[in-house]
């Protein structure tokens, strides 16, 4: 059996740009791409915490160390500078691969600088 699982997550990054007229995609600081194991042109899902929008595009590199998260092309209508975003990738794993699988979880500050890395999401406590 194969399962589609979370591969990478950039948690609560801040959109720095929204460029309607740039060729589609989402430009992501190269440091963040490497930390999250996201390849250039890889499909990404973006979830906008501010407005609830969810959309799919692909990643391109932004200047290393810049903190840039630029939502481009038609997707720019779904995010504005200052919006909080979650960027995720998924991959298909077989049962053998699943036994060793841990997603790359990257947490950032308000300037999109890495503050923590992880591989597990804590169990959510009952309210």
UniProtKB/Swiss-Prot annotation:
Its main location: cytoplasm. The modification Pyruvic acid (Ser) is found at residue 25. Substrate binds at residues 57, 73-75. Its EC number is 4.1.1.11. The active site is at residues 25, 58. InterPro entries: Asp_de-COase-like_dom_sf (IPR009010), Asp_decarbox (IPR003190). Heterooctamer of four alpha and four beta subunits. Belongs to the PanD family. This is Aspartate 1-decarboxylase.
């Amino acid at each position: 059996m194969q399962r589609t699982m979370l591969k990478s997550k950039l948690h609560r990054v801040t959109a720095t740009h929204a460029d309607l007229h740039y060729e589609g995609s989402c430009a992501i600081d190269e440091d963040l791409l490497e930390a999250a194991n996201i390849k250039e042109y890889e499909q990404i899902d973006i979830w906008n915490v501010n407005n609830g929008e969810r959309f799919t595009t692909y990643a391109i590199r932004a200047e290393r160390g810049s903190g840039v998260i630029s939502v481009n092309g038609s997707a720019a209508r779904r995010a504005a500078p200052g919006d909080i975003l979650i960027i995720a990738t998924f991959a298909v794993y077989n049962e053998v691969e699943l036994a060793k699988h841990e997603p790359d979880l990257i947490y950032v500050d308000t300037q999109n600088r890495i503050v923590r890395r992880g591989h597990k999401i804590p169990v959510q406590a009952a309210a």
